[in-house]
Amino acid sequence: MLYEMHMHTPLCKHARGEPGEYAAFAERRGLAGIVVTCHNPTNDGWSPHVRMGVAEFDQYVAMVENARQEWMGRVDIRLGIESDYIPGMEPWLETLNGMAEFHHVLGSVHPHLEDYRDRFYTGDFAAYEETYFDHLAMAAETGLFDTIAHPDLVKRVSPDQWDLMRAMGSICLSLDRIAKAGTAMEVNTSGLNTEYGELYPNKPMLREMLKRNIPVVLGADAHDPGRVAADFESALDILSCVGYTHINVFLDRQRREIPISEARNQLLKI
């Protein structure tokens, strides 16, 4: 029942490999399937260098459908999307959600993007952190997303200025709102390969999420086929250590629980 819930395609202009190549690696890792979640098109020119264009959306849907048919009976391939959120994007995102039958809609705030920094960074990094965590909560409150992706990504922007203790107040306020909205949050293993060497989110944030009974979704944010299910074993160990007993997947935009013990047993080593 374990799926890779966060992965990309070359249409985002910074990933390599077709969906079938990701499926092949998923099969080797013992996964039941993958949900392709490439970066969404926008209708206002927001960060066009890291996403498909509106004119490429039909190609994206067809690419995933072709792979689904090719791999049917071996690896279950589903269509998803990772959509950027900032306040004011809601009408377009609502339209986009109706343009295809998505199985998993990730909501993302990318504070390292130039467009985001230009609009929201005032020179005060502490204030920037507050804005970021406020936007995560706002994204959840829209009801447009199943899962909030890589939820402490702001630490990547300026590592020398990131202060977790300072940010915890903003984090907890954000988590209160996300929990009330009933939105899941991602545990993204790509953070283990950064200078921090920790998940997105970090352990203290995971503990606060657990206190609020926020369900978690595991994803590697794979931009290369070889990254499918990367470090899932480590992430499951960390989640168990924190106190989580289940992870979740979304299929047909419905959340399904998987015991961590079951997920761990499903994974194959390569």
Q: Which residues does each predicted region cover?
A:
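An N-terminally biased module of ancient metal coordination in phosphate/nucleic-acid-related enzymes
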Residues: 1-83, 87, 157-158, 163-166, ...
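Charged catalytic cores and adjacent phosphate/nucleic-acid-binding surfaces used
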Residues: 1-9, 19, 162-270
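Hydrophobic faces of well-ordered beta-strands that scaffold small-molecule active sites
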Residues: 3-7, 34-36, 77-81, 105-107, ...
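Non-catalytic positions within long, well-ordered alpha-helices that form the structural scaffold/packing
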Residues: 23, 27, 98, 140-141, ...
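Flexible loop residues that form catalytic
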Residues: 39, 110, 153-156, 190, ...
